[in-house]
Amino acid sequence: VMDVVYNHVMSADDFCINKLVPGYFSRINEDGSYSNGSGCGNDTASERNMVRKYIVDSVCYWADEYHMDGFRFDLVGLLDTDTINEIVEEVHKTHPDVIFYGEGWTMETGVTKDNVTLATQRNSASTPDFAFFNDNMRDGLKGSVFDTATFGFVSGATNAEKKMADSFMANESWCKEPSQIINYASCHDNNTLFDRIAGSKTTSSEEDIIKMNNLAAAFYMTAEGVPFLQAGEEMLRTKVNDDGTFNSNSYNAGDEVNSIKW
C-alpha cells in the first residue's frame, strides 16, 4: 500500500503547474493568500477539472506501472468526493482489488466552487468504496493523541464501555458500513501504542503495559471493520530519544529512533 499526498505541495509558489497557470492548482483565499487547511502552506484545488485529471492520472499510473495493492491518502478530507470516486472508478476498471483509505479529518479550506463535498468521515456515504481511519477507536483505546495524560479503555478510563462497544460494532456516528472503517490504535503519527500507554500509566509495571497493548490489539483486530496496525506494534515498538523521552513526532528523527528493533 502506497502513502500518497495530493492535498498540498511543498511550495505552492514554486510548483510547476502554478508556474504555468498561476493559482490554478491551489486554493486561494479572497485576500490572495493560499488556503492552508493542510497546515503545510497550501491546499490542492482538486475540484478543478484539470487538477482532478492530474490526480486521477497519477494514481492510475502508480496502479498500472507499479502494481500497488492499495493507496492511503494523506489528509483526504481536503479533497473532494468527485475526485475520490473517479480515482476509485478508474483504478478498479483494471485493478478491482486495489483498496483505498485515508485520513478523513474535517479541516477548513477555501474551495473554489459551489456545492463541493469534501471526502471527510462524515461524508463517507458519498464515497462508498473508500475507507477512513477511525479516531474514535484510536483515542478510545489508549487516550487522546492530543493529551497524553488521558487514559483509554485498555488503561483504565472510566465510563468508556459504551463508546468502545459502539466502535467494536461499527456503530459510528459518521459511518455505518464496516468496510469503510479502518480500526487502529497507532500509526506513524504520534506515539506508538506502547509509548502512549507507558506515558500515561507511569506507575504500571511493564508486564501490565504489555497486557494493555495486547488488549488493544485484540480489540481492533476483532472489531467490525478493517484492522490496521503500525509495523512493529505487535512486538511493542517504541520510539525513544537520546534523553529517554518518548518521541511522538519522529518524521525528522534518525534510524536510532525509527528503526524496528527486530
List each model region and its residues:
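Structural preference for beta-strand elements that scaffold enzyme active sites
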Residues: 1, 68-72, 97-101, 183, ...
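Short, flexible loop/turn elements at secondary-structure junctions
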Residues: 6, 77, 104, 155-159, ...
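Short, solvent-exposed loop/turn and secondary-structure capping segments
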Residues: 11-17, 111-113, 194-197, 240-244
